[in-house]
A protein has these predicted regions:
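Active-site-adjacent structural elements that line small-molecule/cofactor binding pockets in enzymes
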Residues: 1-322
């Protein structure tokens, strides 16, 4: 049976509001909570709370639900040791609950701290190297090495956990899917009826197994037009070049997204609705592609808490056949 996680957006809401959403999500019956990990939003003005301290607060404010990053990037912001250390810290405080989503990142979050944004091939190679470092640190190894992207000198984790993280790796193409197969317990992607089947086939052919995680934006409001206007700013996150190339200025990214994507295209790629039945139908379409987890990213603006309550009252019971 598919599990349904709430995705909370550090780019859109202040951290205290997201904490309310996390508590409401557990009460509504969501199966987990996924937090974005951004230095900057995709537009201005936006938000940019730090996901790692927020996750500690979310773990303390909730009782049982799994929680983690969706996703953390392997770039200039974080040496892999910091990611490995942060995850172990959460696991020691909330055993059995944290997961870790990993991706190759965006220039949006790396260039402002001094990264020279690499080619797509090097983005993936850097993620591969970072995952190798984290894997060995979680095993208790001490590392001294000069890699292509990271340096380690007598590096080890002095606090370890019994459990390794459920590691879900973001992939949109065959090279990243191979990395996900090599290191991950699942593949995280944005569902697309045309490209997702071949992506999953390539991942499995490379030895990948485990969870298939789909992430989807949703915006609910009492009026469908309001739901669209509320989520419109997320067009800045849609163009593929914003991930592949050096786009790092939020205002320009939003303007470019608005130019590149019509409202009709956006409504096909995101779940934008006032009718809970339409939301259920759209999620059912995603399920036809075979996910085990769907992360429903709540971009409902001023109606965010109402949307979570609606999911608990109508959407999740319908999806589960209650």
């Amino acid at each position: 049976m598919t599990r349904y996680f709430l995705g909370v957006s550090q780019e859109e809401f202040p951290p205290e509001a997201l904490l309310e959403q996390a508590v409401a999500a557990e009460q509504a019956g969501f199966d987990g909570i996924s937090s974005s990990d951004h230095l900057q939003p995709w537009w201005e003005p936006g938000e940019s709370g730090h996901t790692w301290p927020w996750l500690g607060a979310a773990g303390a404010a909730t009782a049982k639900v799994p929680f983690g990053t969706g996703v953390t990037s392997t770039g200039a912001r974080y040496h892999p040791a910091l990611i490995a250390q942060a995850w172990v810290t959460l696991e020691r405080m909330f055993p059995g609950r944290p997961f870790l989503g990993i991706g190759s990142g965006e220039a949006l979050n790396e260039v402002p701290v001094g990264d020279d944004w690499p080619s797509v091939g090097d983005q993936i190679a850097r993620m591969d190297e970072a995952l190798s470092i984290m894997d060995r640190l979680w095993k208790g190894e001490t590392l001294t090495e000069e890699g292509r992207f990271y340096t380690c000198t007598d590096l080890k984790l002095h606090t370890l956990s019994e459990r390794r993280p459920p590691l879900w790796i973001s992939a949109f193409g065959p090279k990243a899917a191979e990395v996900a197969a090599r290191w991950g317990d699942g593949l995280w992607t944005l569902p697309d009826p045309e490209s997702t089947p071949s992506l999953l086939e390539g991942w499995r052919d490379a030895g990948g197994s485990g969870d298939v995680i789909f992430q989807a934006l949703f915006s609910w409001a009492p009026d469908a037009d309001e739901a669209l206007e509320t989520v419109r700013k997320w067009k800045g996150a849609q163009p593929q070049e914003h991930y592949k190339e050096d786009w790092h200025e939020p205002r320009k990214m939003y303007a470019h997204g608005e130019e590149q994507m019509s409202d009709e295209e956006f409504e096909r790629s995101a779940i934008i609705a006032s009718d809970p039945g339409e939301i259920v139908a759209r999620i059912r379409e995603l399920e036809e592609l075979g996910p085990t987890v769907i992360v429903l990213q709540n971009n409902s603006g001023p109606h965010a808490l109402e949307a979570i309550e609606l999911f608990g009252r109508e959407v999740l019971p319908a999806l589960r056949g209650a």
